[in-house]
Every structure is written in structure tokens, then in C-alpha cells.
């Protein structure tokens, strides 16, 4: 019998990674990271990346697979995750997927049409950039990443310019190329989806603050300093735009003081968690558990039963 795909889903700081590790160790599994920031080498503290000791206890996949100067699309993730799942199954082990990047889960389960759906977060970022720098600045940026589309669009065609840039950010490829590509299939079977929910919003906010302050104490600013000093990175890149990293990047460039950076970092993380929770509400094929003291025992019991008493 082919091992199913077990997915551990939930907002940031809810306790997904700890649960996934426990399940993988108890059920003979290997972990596949579903995190758009953990793919980057050098982004360790701020992404809560599993330590070398944890990775020695249980194999982890799709971590440290890209340089921060590179982009990585949902389509690439779906391809790489399917390869990792096949390899894990070939060893007779259980694929355990864990993370909070909804677009990655969506791409893996349902596949991708050549044209990605609109993304509210990316669109909001582009609208803010247009408000700050003007539509012609966005058109110049489009010329750099997709000259074919830029030549076709009027420099004042805000809506279509934003869409072309949005497609590039979501896929890592020019709109003109995506329009010529076939779609990508998803999983052929239904994954077993476990969705973790915080007991209350205040509980999650306390955990977010405690974790962010612990990351700062562990050297997160120094980690971003090392990235900043490379000289080949900018806010155009997804690695630098990751929650926490972006706010510290602004602090290093003198845009705010240390206390303001902390406040903005916490706010950005809370907003990210809110978006994740909103997306997870639409995952009607998942089984929901409250992240309390009984979580591990309850999920283990449920998963063991669902897998036929493993």
C-alpha cells in the first residue's frame, strides 16, 4: 500500500514543526518543508529553520535549496515536493509535509494552471509601490524582468503592468513565458490534512511575540546584517521580503529605530498569521485540532487510525 501524504498545516507560531517532528519519528516518516523562506540558505533564525540536531533525528527535505539571490516559484515547489514524496515512499516511509505557505500546498494538491490566481498580498505590495514610486517605475521594473510584456503594454497601463509583475513574483518567470506553458498536475490522491488552530487569538499573539523576541536574542539582526553586507541582495527579492527580515533590513538602512523595527516585525507577523488563518478556513477537506496540551496525543491517535493502525 502506498503511504499517504500527511500535511500539518496552521498559522505561524502555532506549533506545527514540533508536532510534525513527533509524528515523523513515531510513524517512520520524513519531513518535507512547505515554507517559502526555509528554502533559502542563510535564513535560519528568522525562519525557525530546524537545527542540525533536529535534522539529524529525522530527514528534512526542501530546506536550504536556494541562495537568497534566487527566486523559487510555487510550480518549482510542487515539482520538487512531488519528487521528494516519491523518494520518501520508495524507502517505505511516510511523507510528512509541514509549513505555512498556502500557495505551495495549493500548487501541490491541485496543480497549477499556467496562469496563477491573483494574490491579495502581492497585489497590495505592488499597489503600495506604485503609490510610492509611480506606475512608470513599475513599468521600468517590468522591462528588466519581462521585456516582451513591457514592450506590449503602455507605460501607464497600471492594471496590466501590476498583473505582469504579480505573475513574475508568484512564478519566478515572465508573464510572456507563462502564457505559453502548459499546466502542471497536482497530487493524484487526497492528502491527509491536519489543521492546527490556536485556542484564541491572544494566545497566538503571545507566542508570536515570544518567538520573535527569542529570535532577536538568538542573533537574528546579525543574520540579516550578513545578508545585507553581501551587496547583491535587495528588497526586490523574496528572501529579503520575508517577514521579520524585511523589517530588520529597513532598520539596517536607517529607515527606523530598533524599537520601531520590533513593533513593525511583530505587526507584520500577526498580519501574516491572520492571512494564513483566513486561507485555512477554506481548506474544508482538513481535520481541525486545537493547539493545546492534548494536541500531540489527539493527532497521533487520529492519524494512526486513519493510516490503519500504524
From Swiss-Prot:
GO terms for biological process: tRNA modification. SUPFAM superfamilies: P-loop containing nucleoside triphosphate hydrolases. Monomer. The lineage of its organism: Bacteria, Pseudomonadati, Pseudomonadota, Gammaproteobacteria, Chromatiales. Residues 35-38, 159-163, 274-281 are annotated as: Interaction with substrate tRNA. This is tRNA dimethylallyltransferase. ATP binds at residues 10-17. It comes from the Bacteria. Substrate binds at residues 12-17.
Amino acid at each position: 500500500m502506498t503511504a499517504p501524504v500527511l500535511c500539518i498545516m496552521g498559522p505561524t507560531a502555532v506549533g506545527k514543526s514540533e508536532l510534525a517532528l513527533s509524528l515523523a519519528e513515531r510513524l517512520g516518516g520524513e519531513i518535507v518543508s512547505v515554507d517559502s523562506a526555509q528554502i533559502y540558505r542563510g535564513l535560519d533564525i528568522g525562519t525557525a529553520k530546524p537545527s542540525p540536531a533536529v535534522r539529524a533525528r529525522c530527514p528534512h527535505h526542501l530546506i536550504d535549496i536556494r541562495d537568497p539571490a534566487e527566486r523559487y516559484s510555487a510550480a518549482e515547489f510542487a515539482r520538487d515536493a512531488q519528487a521528494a514524496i516519491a523518494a520518501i515512499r520508495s524507502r517505505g516511509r511516510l511523507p510528512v509535509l509541514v509549513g505555512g505557505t498556502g500557495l505551495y500546498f495549493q500548487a501541490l494538491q491541485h496543480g497549477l494552471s499556467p496562469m496563477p490566481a491573483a494574490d491579495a498580498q502581492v497585489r497590495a505590495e505592488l499597489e503600495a509601490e506604485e503609490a510610492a514610486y509611480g506606475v512608470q517605475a513599475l513599468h521600468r521594473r517590468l522591462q528588466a524582468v519581462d521585456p516582451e510584456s513591457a514592450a506590449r503594454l503602455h507605460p501607464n497601463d497600471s492594471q496590466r503592468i501590476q498583473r505582469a509583475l504579480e505573475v513574475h513574483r508568484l512564478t519566478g518567470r515572465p508573464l510572456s513565458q507563462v502564457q505559453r506553458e502548459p499546466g502542471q498536475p497536482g497530487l493524484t490522491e487526497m492528502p491527509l490534512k491536519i489543521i492546527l488552530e490556536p485556542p484564541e487569538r491572544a494566545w497566538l499573539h503571545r507566542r508570536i511575540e515570544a518567538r520573535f523576541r527569542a529570535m532577536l536574542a538568538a542573533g537574528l539582526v546579525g543574520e540579516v546584517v550578513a545578508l545585507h553586507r553581501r551587496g547583491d541582495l535587495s528588497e526586490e527579492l523574496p528572501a529579503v521580503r520575508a517577514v521579520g527580515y524585511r523589517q530588520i533590513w529597513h532598520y539596517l538602512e536607517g529607515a527606523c529605530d530598533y524599537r520601531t523595527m520590533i513593533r513593525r516585525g511583530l505587526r507584520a507577523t500577526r498580519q501574516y498569521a491572520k492571512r494564513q488563518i483566513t486561507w485555512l478556513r477554506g481548506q474544508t477537506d482538513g481535520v481541525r485540532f486545537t493547539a493545546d496540551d492534548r494536541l500531540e496525543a489527539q493527532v497521533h491517535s487520529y492519524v494512526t487510525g486513519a493510516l490503519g493502525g500504524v
